[in-house]
A protein has these predicted regions:
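N-terminal, positively charged/glycine-rich alpha-helical extensions of SAM-dependent methyltransferases
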Residues: 1-21
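Class I SAM-dependent methyltransferase Rossmann-like catalytic core
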Residues: 18-32
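C-terminal alpha-helical "lid/dimerization" subdomain adjacent to the S-adenosyl-L-methionine
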Residues: 27, 150-199
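Conserved alpha-helix/loop element of class I SAM-dependent methyltransferases that forms part
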Residues: 31-48
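Class I SAM-dependent methyltransferase SAM/SAH-binding core
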Residues: 53-55, 59-108
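Short conserved loop adjoining the S-adenosyl-L-methionine
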Residues: 110-114
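A conserved beta-strand element that flanks and buttresses the S-adenosyl-L-methionine
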Residues: 121
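A short glycine-rich, Lys/Arg-flanked "PGG" loop and its adjoining helix->strand segment in the class I
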Residues: 134-145
Length: 203
């Protein structure tokens, strides 16, 4: 389902409108972002899954790449921006994977699909979310047994990252504190070249 022009952001979240949504595709010309996307895509494709969701899927680049490399998987991308949803849907059609990938309006506080997932993930989106603690506990309910919620962010380590606004960075201590607040244990934290991935598993 493509967006109808109404966004689903809540107060305090960074909004992506028409121009910023289309301009975001240019981020891949920046070497640091290319390395980040490569890290995420390689990391996810090395996991076992048949049903996967991207929360804050943006222009759909990561999810489309992941699904194109796993012919047995279906993917769902949700984003609060109708413009991002349209861009992701067009990308899936161009790549010939629209039968296995669905982009729709949604957000961390309003997930519009039913059923369980093997993996739910977010990429450089989690730091935008309002009420992260509630979002994490809600997301864990959508995972199959041993399903994973994987959060990918930029960390303060690395020269480029230190130039970013601090609010856009997350480190190991942020995720440890999140685990304590939610009571959801962290299965793994991986740091790689200025990027970080925290994994929560539904035991």
């Amino acid at each position: 389902m493509e967006g109808n022009g109404q966004d689903m952001y809540v107060a305090g979240e960074e909004r992506f409108g028409f121009f910023t949504s289309h301009g975001y595709s240019l981020s891949r010309i920046i070497p640091t972002f290319r390395r980040f996307y490569t890290f995420v895509i390689n990391d996810i494709t090395n996991q076992k899954f048949s049903r996967i969701m991207d929360i804050g899927s943006g222009n759909g680049y990561v999810l489309a790449q992941v699904i194109s490399q796993n012919s047995n998987a279906t993917g769902y991308g949700i984003d609060p921006s109708p413009y991002m949803v349209r861009i992701g849907s067009r990308r899936a059609r161009r790549m010939g994977i629209s039968a296995r990938v669905t982009f729709m309006m949604g957000s961390s506080h309003e997930i519009p699909t039913k059923g369980k997932f093997d993996i739910i993930y977010s990429t450089m989106s989690f730091h935008h979310w309002s009420n992260r603690e509630k979002a994490v506990t809600d997301i864990m309910q959508l995972l199959d047994d041993n399903g994973k919620f994987m959060i990918y962010e930029a960390s303060p380590r690395g020269g480029f990252n230190r130039k970013l606004v601090k609010a856009h960075l997350m480190d190991r201590e942020d995720f440890i504190l999140l685990s304590k607040k939610t009571g959801v244990p962290i299965a793994e934290i991986v740091e790689n070249g200025g990027f970080i991935r925290a994994t929560f598993v539904n035991r």
